[in-house]
Amino acid sequence: MAILSNLEPKRVFEIFEEMCAIPHGSANTKAISDWCVAFGEKLGLEHYQDEANNVILIAPATPGYEDAPAVILQGHVDMVCEKEAGCAKDMDKEGLDLFVDGDLVGAKGTTLGGDDGIAVAMALAALEDTTVQHPRLEVVLTTDEEIGMLGAAVLDVTPLQGRTMLNIDSEEEGIFTVGCAGGGSVFCHLPLIREEFAGETLAVRVSGLVGGHSGVEINKGRANANVLMGRLLRAMAAVTELRLVSAEGGSKDNAIPTAAAAVVTVADGSAARKAAETLAAEMKKEYRIADPGLTVAVETVETKSLPMDEVTTGKALCMLTCLPNGVQAMSMDIPGLVQTSLNIGILKCGDDEMTAVCSVRSSVASQKQMVRDRLRCLTEQLGGRVDVIGDYPAWEYLPDSPLRERMIKVYREQYGKEPVVETIHAGLECGLLGEKLPGLDCVSFGPDLTDIHTPRERMHIASVQRTWKLLCEVLKRSK
């Protein structure tokens, strides 16, 4: 049964719902990519698909727009797959369970993928709708944006004529983004040596955190579960001999982790528990505003896994304690804008290696490199190694932008007020595509999406309606 079929704009929501029936998390984009190609083929459009599953669909200009310069509509097909504790949904294999609650669209127990499925839905609807007037329309749908903009990095832009681009990957209506931070993922690998150790084995769990986007919400003071876990383990090791067995937390480096778990073997279980309980009470006070749901649990468990030896445990706890996290510098040019940050988004443990994955962001290239150097220096001092993956450049503000001025004028007429024009502390593909398309004039915008990258994600229906109207009018005036 179609859940969104009664919503307007009808085709935008229908296409979005069709997308949601197809699993399309990052690194799982072949099916959704093929679906986009089939959509274009059905309309008889010029289309391209590459090995990274990027898709380009091109529609000719509508009558009267043949001499107007081409316009690019751009978004990404992958979504962040997060779900509530206890949710049985296999997001690699199953579609989403959508619901409508008043003016909101959500997915039961999981992320919705409005970031950036709504861009795909609007772009495809614009291609299909014969009442939408536009120049040559070049729809660029990239993959794996959420794990380092990997699709955009390898996109062949040869088919593209446009040097004006509407990126529909912003989550707050009325804000036009015209610049963003650069960034990338840093993988810090620590080799592990394991040996027998007699004692009581405990499971330590941190849960109930708010989490959120590691770029635009990094300055909200929210706790990082991996950082809290490092503090707890350090406190326990201070009162009794402790060996780390495993530590895990988070699943996306660009999402602030909401939970983490570790297994340790200790000489004195009672002392370890008391130390954890004492620190947990202090942490709850620290985060009573930002993370009122913070919970710490310690319980006895059994494990067949060997713990790490004393030296390795010390190195692992040092890494968890000393890895920088959060806001590192604020912009001196734009009040209130984060300039440099990082997020320890993923912590995972294998038999012979522990890995912490950090999302590093900065609008200043030299500061981005400085943070990477810190991570490399610390990790190598502990005997580990570092890999940098998915590097992307900052998107620099363009002083002279005809597209921005056109969008401001349309917005003013439709809304009766001025839009907010800003740069953001988050990564957008505009920087990468701007490098490939010299002279690219680009603005990022979109409807209201709240709590993206979390199961609380919601898309606002009325905002989608207004944003669609804005998009259609901007296309109409693109000549």
Name every feature range the model reports, one short phrase each.
Residues 65-163, 198-201, 310-314, 321-325, ...:
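Active-site metal-coordination/substrate-binding segment of hydrolases
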Residues 222-239, 268-269, 315-321, 329, ...:
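His/Asp/Glu-rich mid-to-C-terminal helical/loop segments that flank catalytic regions of hydrolases
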Residues 9-12, 332, 339-341, 345-352, ...:
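Zn-dependent metallopeptidase/amidohydrolase metal-coordination segment
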Residues 253-330:
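A conserved active-site cap/scaffold subdomain adjacent to cofactor or substrate pockets
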Residues 239-252, 332-348:
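A structural supersecondary motif
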Residues 2-103:
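Acidic/His- and Gly-rich active-site-bordering loop/insert found
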Residues 17-21, 250-252, 261, 295-307, ...:
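A short beta-alpha structural unit
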Residues 134-225, 233, 237:
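Fold-level recognition of mixed alpha/beta catalytic cores in primary-metabolism enzymes, strongest
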